[in-house]
Structures are given as structure tokens and as C-alpha cells.
Amino acid sequence: MKMALDVEKEIAGLKAQAEARPGAKRKLSMVVFSGDLDKHIASMIIATGAAAMGMEVVVFYTFWGTAALRDPSKRVGGKNLVEKMFGMMLPRGRDMTKLSKMNMAGAGTAMIKAVMKKKNVASLGEMFDLAGQLGVKIIICEMSMDLMGFKFEEMIDYPGLSIGGVATFLADAGESAVQLFI
């Protein structure tokens, strides 16, 4: 299981990084900027791995990453033309995200999802469910939501999902032993 070994190596590296900063909390603060499927998968593997190791985990979704948090079943009115255009052009939820490389008009995305299923790797939706169960906190960037015309009411149901700004993230990251940008 090469993927499992890679994840274990990544988690061991995070643990070493956390222990190298005395005074910092056993905490991971992560920015998810990308809207790509593979990067969302990586962020959830790292977040759930760190939470399973007993670390506090906060994930700050900003810019293109915020689209993955949209709930495809929720519709919100009252948007202007630009906001409607962003809504139409960006993925409506995590299941609509695409690979950053080798997407091949969606064939690559379908293949990676099939391989994950065949190898009993949790889907992105299952990873989000696990993250919620493990207490991973998710904060959505308020400015990104405003720029793209997203409303909190159209976001996924996730325990403790909140909105915050860059100051919220920086205060959180300042006390964290590990910070990542994906």
C-alpha cells in the first residue's frame, strides 16, 4: 500500500515539525486555496491524519477552494450577474472538482475516483465526514465568499463550519506547530 506509506511518512514529518517548535500547540493550521480534487484529497488525508494523532486541526478555505464547500442541493437567490456567473463557472461542491493534472476532459477524474474505490480509499465526501467526526474545524474565508458571491446558506452541512477572515486564520496559525498551504 504505497499510498498508505506515503501518508504515514507525511504524518510522521508533521509530528516531527510540531515537536520542533517548543511552546507551539500540537495544532495544524492549513490553508486550502486550490479548487483541484487531488489537492482537496491531500488536504483531507493530512487533516484527518493529524486529528487522529490527537492534534487540533483548523482548515481555512479560501478563493478557489471555497467552491468545494458548496452544497449542490442548496440554491440561494438575490445574486447579481457577476455572482451568478461565478456560481455557474465554478464547481458546485466537492464532487464536481477536477484533477489538477491529467484531467483529460473528466476521464482522469473518473479514473482516480474508480481507483480509490477499488483500493478501498475513502472518497472525498467520506473524508469530510471523518474530519467532522474527528473535530477538524473548517473556516471559510469571508472575503473569498464575498468576492465570488457565495452565501453561507449554500455551503455544506458540516459540524462547526464557520466564516472568518485572514486575521482569524493568522491568529490561529500563529499558535500552531504546523502550518500548510495547499
Residues covered by each model-derived region:
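Glycine-rich loop at the start of a catalytic domain that most often binds anionic cofactors/ligands
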Residues: L69-K79
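A glycine-rich helix N-cap at a beta->alpha junction
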Residues: G77-M116, N120
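Histidine-anchored nucleotide/phosphate-binding helix
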Residues: I41-G54, V59
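Ligand-binding beta-strand-loop-alpha-helix segment within the catalytic cores
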Residues: K117-M143, D157-G160
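Short internal beta-strands
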Residues: V57-F63, I139-E142
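Short, glycine-rich nucleotide/cofactor-binding loops
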Residues: M30-I41, L69-R70, V115-K119
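Long, leucine- and charge-enriched amphipathic alpha-helices
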Residues: M1-A24
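Glycine-rich, aromatic-bearing surface loops/beta-hairpins
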Residues: I140, M145, E153-I182
